[in-house]
Amino acid sequence: MFQTFRKWFWSERYWLPPTIKWSDLEDHDGLVFVKASHLYITIPYAFLLMVVRYFFEKFVATPLANALGIKKTQHKIKPNAILENFFKHSTSKPSHTDIYGLAKKCNLTERQVERWLRIRQKQNKPCRLQKFQESCWRFTFYLLITMAGAVFLYDKPWAYDLWEVWNDYPRQPLLPSQYWYYILEMSFYWSLVFSLSTDIKRKDFLAHVIHHLAAISLMSFSWCANYIRSGTLVMFIHDISDIWLESAKMFSYAGWKQTCNTLFFIFTVVFFISRFIIFPFWILYCTLILPLHYLEPFFSYIFLNLQLMILQGLHVYWGYFILKMLNRCIFTQNVQDVRSDNEEEEEEEEEEEAESTKGKETEYLKNGLGTNRHLIANGQHGR
């Protein structure tokens, strides 16, 4: 049964243009062609990247965060077995009846119980240091892979002449630079998938899962069908905007608000140029229109462009939130990240600390969230 499925899955009619056979893509005369087995190494490399990330966050990102004044927030409370048991088994916001009953059991005031539960909830939420570490790691990878991509592509004719993307397709040998560009990029996305359970949970969690899996699927498919030339162009224009996003988030967590806003505006410009001009009018034109001058439409051609259009749909999704943030910046005084992490704003944390020292709950209500024109309150995150 497995052999039957394997034969069906790798049928040439699904992957290659008519008249082309897998035997045409066998290595010969020192030329190496893509093989699906090349991608197996991306899984162990993904775990290796996770190890590198651990040491990077510990020995590079954390000292950098400390130098920028970002410290690990400590939320300390007195141990209380009754309240701890209630907290672990409660799935919703405690009602007034719950608070009243707990106060009686623990011989505490209702206000003390509410404050204990609120602080205990904060202990389970990521602090600014953890968010900075994540952004610093992503910024470093995107910066290095974009620089590598620029080096790999600058002397390639298909980077300047899109017709060269399809010249002699699919009999295009694999270059060492293309191999490492793909392997590192795919390994990174696998590492993001594997770390989803431990990374900071965000409101657009599902969109991130779809994005990561779509990226891996697109890269895997383009590799197996030998769409390497167009694939490297897609990866490069996607990585280049993420550098600015992650750097803006880093400065947001550090409290460098003017720098953060400047970087966010640069990110916005780069994002819309790369995702709404270059991608649809250059990349999609290259993959959707130009091949028809060489080949008749076939399955992998259709499937490739279907995946690229799904990717463009995600661009529209994230572009909507970016425009929404800019709209708040221009027309309102209170700017929040509409797709930020599921946690309170940093200003709210400061106000709660003031409440605990002064013992006045009304102080928190009066202060509110402030009117800071800060574009990325808790770090806009999206690809």
Curated annotation (Swiss-Prot):
Topology Cytoplasmic: residue spans: 323-383
Q: What is its EC number?
A: 2.3.1.24, 2.3.1.298, 2.3.1.297
**Basic and acidic residues bias locations:** 355-364
The UniProt entry's GO CC annotations, sorted and at most eight, read: endoplasmic reticulum; endoplasmic reticulum membrane
User: What does the record say about the knockout?
Assistant: Newborn mice die shortly after birth from transepidermal water loss. Defects are due to a complete loss of ultra long chain (more than C26:0) ceramides. Newborn skin appears unwrinkled, erythematous and sticky. Skin is also prone to C.albicans infection.
Against SMART domains, the record matches this protein to: TLC (SM00724)
* Membrane topology of the entry: Multi-pass membrane protein
Q: Which GO terms describe its molecular function?
A: DNA binding; sphingosine N-acyltransferase activity
Residues that the record marks as modified (Phosphoserine) are: S340
Q: Name one GO biological process term.
A: cornification
Regions crossing the membrane: 32-52, 139-159, 174-194, 205-225, 263-283, 302-322
Alphabetical list of SUPFAM superfamilies matching this protein? Homeodomain-like
Region annotation (Homeobox-like) ranges: 66-127
Entry comment describing in which tissues the protein is expressed: Predominantly expressed in testis. In skin, present in the upper stratum spinosum and stratum granulosum (at protein level).
- Acidic residues: compositionally biased ranges: 342-354
**InterPro entries in the cross-refs:** HD (IPR001356), Homeodomain-like_sf (IPR009057), Lag1/Lac1-like (IPR016439), TLC-dom (IPR006634)
**In which compartments does the protein localize?**
Endoplasmic reticulum membrane
Record's keyword terms, sorted: Endoplasmic reticulum, Lipid biosynthesis, Lipid metabolism, Membrane, Phosphoprotein, Transferase, Transmembrane, Transmembrane helix
**What broad class describes the main subcellular location of this protein?**
endoplasmic reticulum
Extract the ranges annotated as region (Disordered).
340-383
- Give all residue intervals belonging to the TLC domain: 130-331
Reaction(s) catalysed (UniProt annotation): a very long-chain fatty acyl-CoA + a sphingoid base = an N-(very-long-chain fatty acyl)-sphingoid base + CoA + H(+); docosanoyl-CoA + sphinganine = N-docosanoylsphinganine + CoA + H(+); tetracosanoyl-CoA + sphinganine = N-tetracosanoylsphinganine + CoA + H(+); hexacosanoyl-CoA + sphinganine = N-hexacosanoylsphinganine + CoA + H(+)
Functionally, this protein is described as follows: Ceramide synthase that catalyzes the transfer of the acyl chain from acyl-CoA to a sphingoid base, with high selectivity toward very- and ultra-long-chain fatty acyl-CoA (chain length greater than C22). N-acylates sphinganine and sphingosine bases to form dihydroceramides and ceramides in de novo synthesis and salvage pathways, respectively. It is crucial for the synthesis of ultra-long-chain ceramides in the epidermis, to maintain epidermal lipid homeostasis and terminal differentiation.
Name the record gives this protein: Ceramide synthase 3
* Organism field: Mus musculus
